[in-house]
Amino acid sequence: MDKNKNISMAVIKRLPKYHRYLNELMKNDVDRISSKELGEKIGFTASQIRQDLNCFGDFGQQGYGYNVKELYTQINSILGLDKEYNAVLIGAGNIGQAIANYTRFDKLGIMITAIFDANPKLIGIKIRDIEIRDIDELGSFLKSDSVDIGVICVPKKSAQRVSDELINGGIRGIWNFAPIDLAVPKDVKVENVHLSESVSTLIYQLHQQR
């Protein structure tokens, strides 16, 4: 993939869904699938799927469709999931613990190497054999260990400070669960997961049905 190619984030955000469904097809021993069949499964049009995939190359054959395993492997590579990424998790409350316990991350190549929190009652507790450390140790850890992703699960009032420390420590990817839009340099990539916004969208849809 040409990294300088201008591909919209809308296309990029659809790729994980293709990736997930193709993985399910492989588990069910499906060897090939047409764009029409794939679209029916995931709720996209066949034309949309072809346009998305054409951004990265020519994967299908007319009259044959897509080789499921080959397409899965290609999307896996496009998304960078064929590599490993070290992550640190800051905030070991309910959301943080749920993320730390999510075993699917290992299969995506994301390795949580350390967990930090400010609560003395949590420090020393282990989550999947990873001991929760004092947040004051974060800076020194980032200096001594290679980390790619910072996962922020702290309260809103602490999120920007934590983000700044992660960035100062060399991290260029932040997965933010705090209900705040972080101020970061242009070379730092942030993916926000604002739960209240997500559920508000659902509530709106339910409200429209009443």
Curated annotation (Swiss-Prot):
Keywords: Cytoplasm, DNA-binding, NAD, Repressor, Transcription, Transcription regulation
Transmembrane regions listed in the UniProt entry: none
Cellular localization per UniProt: Cytoplasm
Location of the DNA-binding region in this protein: 17-56
Gene Ontology CC: cytoplasm
Keyword NAD: yes
Keyword set includes Membrane: no
Top-level taxonomic group: Bacteria
Residue positions binding NAD(+): 91-96
Main location: cytoplasm
GO molecular function: DNA binding; DNA-binding transcription factor activity
Subunit text: Homodimer.
Reported function: Modulates transcription in response to changes in cellular NADH/NAD(+) redox state.
Assigned protein family: Belongs to the transcriptional regulatory Rex family.
The name this protein goes by in its record: Redox-sensing transcriptional repressor Rex
Organism this protein belongs to: Clostridium botulinum (strain Eklund 17B / Type B)
Encoding gene per record: rex
